[in-house]
Amino acid sequence: MTDVDESVRRRTAAVSEYRKKLLQHKELESRVRTARENLRGAKKEFNKTEDDLKSLQSVGQIIGEVLRPLDNERLIVKASSGPRYVVGCRSKVDKEKLTSGTRVVLDMTTLTIMRALPREVDPVVYNMLHEDPGNISYSAVGGLGDQIRELRESIELPLMNPELFLRVGIKPPKGVLLYGPPGTGKTLLARAIASNIDANFLKVVSSAIIDKYIGESARLIREMFNYAREHQPCIIFMDEIDAIGGRRFSEGTSADREIQRTLMELLNQLDGFDNLGKVKMIMATNRPDVLDPALLRPGRLDRKIEIPLPNEQSRMDILKIHAAGIAKHGEIDYEAIVKLAEGFNGADLRNICTEAGMFAIRAERDYVIHEDFMKAVRKLSEAKKLESSSHYNADFGKE
């Protein structure tokens, strides 16, 4: 019995000792994990500190411009500060790219060319490129089938299949003018063709080009076309072209003369690029009557596409496109709505859908019914009558 008790006591002591060691092991494992995490954090902090020290100790570099090569090893460069230097070139730099006018990075101490830089781009031109045309399909443009076909023939076909024009023996159009009343879809057409072609898209608001300093506006036009040539295929869309493309006259202020200089630079650039080069121009205006004849002549703007007010069938197509995403209840008689929308443009038809939705919200509904559309078109018809009958005479505003 004594031996049994002794055996039980030893076993109990062994189990207790095992549990104690197990707890100690788990505690040590936890400490090791914590130490490893602290080590990772310390290494990260160390690397960050090393990078900061390198940044503080590093020497800046100079931007210069290649004037001309002297021989295979040396070039004449002009530093941004003004002086000219005869410098060497780093072995890893491709010397064929170092042509006259190339921007380069020079070492601060030895003035060795470290690498070539891309052409400097004006921030205004850079922002033009980052205008997103959106994801617009041709099916989202209603009632303009003929105009879409003509625009695609003038812009898309020369960019995608230039060999067709070579085989036939004709020169493709350089540019297209879209003209028509406001709200008929000129800008929408340009966005649709830009989003359906794998090409760069520069959207230019013509009034934003005009600068108060003489020569700056013409320089922007030059930079815009240079950038387009370097990033072919490219479509340049100039909205409200009447801001700079108005008819020239001999008299006027200095501001008028600056606008005329800008127009002359635009005319020169339109004549300058290759017919089969992949740079195409689309211009839009609702005042074609004020444009300069030199801008409108074939060879610059080869096609003039009128974007008219939609007829009854076109209004039906446009209204259905805008109403497609609206939550509706019951049957909608689009023919009755379209008959009341005589003289409406595409923007007005979109506004009908917006107003119908507002009537539904006012009635505390989350869907639109036919009566909402009828109320909306009647309301906007009254507004259109007011808009068309607003004639002001010389006595307006006088007591």
Swiss-Prot record:
Cross-link annotation Glycyl lysine isopeptide (Lys-Gly) (interchain with G-Cter in ubiquitin), location: K203
Q: Which residues carry this modification: N-acetylthreonine?
A: T2
> According to its UniProt record, what is one Pfam family this protein matches?
AAA
Q: Where does it live in the cell? A: Cytoplasm; Nucleus
One Gene Ontology cellular component annotation? proteasome complex
- PROSITE patterns recorded for this chain? AAA (PS00674)
Cite the PANTHER family for this sequence: 26S PROTEASOME REGULATORY SUBUNIT
Assembly description: Component of the 19S regulatory particle (RP/PA700) base subcomplex of the 26S proteasome. The 26S proteasome is composed of a core protease (CP), known as the 20S proteasome, capped at one or both ends by the 19S regulatory particle (RP/PA700). The RP/PA700 complex is composed of at least 17 different subunits in two subcomplexes, the base and the lid, which form the portions proximal and distal to the 20S proteolytic core, respectively.
Q: What is this protein called?
A: 26S proteasome regulatory subunit 10B homolog A
| Organism, as annotated | Arabidopsis thaliana
